[in-house]
Amino acid sequence: MSTNNSTQQQDELDQIKSKIQDNLISSGNYDIINKQLKLQLYESGWYDKVSQIASRELMDHQQEVNSSNSNSSNSNKKNELTFDQLFAFVKPKAEELVPNEVKQDILNRITKYLDDIIQ
């Protein structure tokens, strides 16, 4: 019985989230907040740092592939780094690099938006 109640609550929560998201987009506030986030990340050097992490990982991976290929005669596609693998490596590091001031500012903007639509 509690599983059914939990599922119902999750469905209601998902509906509320969807309505908020739809309103956020249709009101234009999503674009405003998104542009502000991108600007703050750019100004903080976040994009450059994340790009450096990705480039370093690609170079490290390529060096490992070259090293293993020189030790064995068969090179194959298993050595290729996929986008998903690179993304999984970079994502947590990129999230950690978001400056606290940027996180706080964006959270404040979202909170203000929610306060305004709830009233």
Curated annotation (Swiss-Prot):
Disulfide bond annotation, renumbered to this chain: none
Main location: nucleus
Source taxon at top rank: Eukaryota
Alphabetized UniProt keyword annotations: Activator, Chromatin regulator, Cytoplasm, mRNA transport, Nucleus, Protein transport, Transcription, Transcription regulation, Translocation, Transport
GO biological process, one term: regulation of transcription by RNA polymerase II
GO cellular component: DUBm complex; nuclear pore; nucleoplasm; P-body; SAGA complex; transcription export complex 2
Keyword Plastid (UniProt): no
Compartment(s): Nucleus, Nucleoplasm; Cytoplasm, P-body
Coiled-coil boundaries: none
GO molecular function, a single term: chromatin binding
Pfam families: EnY2
Family to which the UniProt record says this protein belongs: Belongs to the ENY2 family.
Assembly and binders: Component of the nuclear pore complex (NPC)-associated TREX-2 complex (transcription and export complex 2), composed of at least SUS1, SAC3, THP1, SEM1, and CDC31. TREX-2 contains 2 SUS1 chains. The TREX-2 complex interacts with the nucleoporin NUP1. Component of the 1.8 MDa SAGA transcription coactivator-HAT complex. SAGA is built of 5 distinct domains with specialized functions. Within the SAGA complex, SUS1, SGF11, SGF73 and UBP8 form an additional subcomplex of SAGA called the DUB module (deubiquitination module). Interacts directly with THP1, SAC3, SGF11, and with the RNA polymerase II.
Function according to Swiss-Prot or TrEMBL: Involved in mRNA export coupled transcription activation by association with both the TREX-2 and the SAGA complexes. At the promoters, SAGA is required for recruitment of the basal transcription machinery. It influences RNA polymerase II transcriptional activity through different activities such as TBP interaction and promoter selectivity, interaction with transcription activators, and chromatin modification through histone acetylation and deubiquitination.
Protein name as it appears in the record: Transcription and mRNA export factor SUS1
Species the sequence originates in: Candida albicans (strain SC5314 / ATCC MYA-2876)
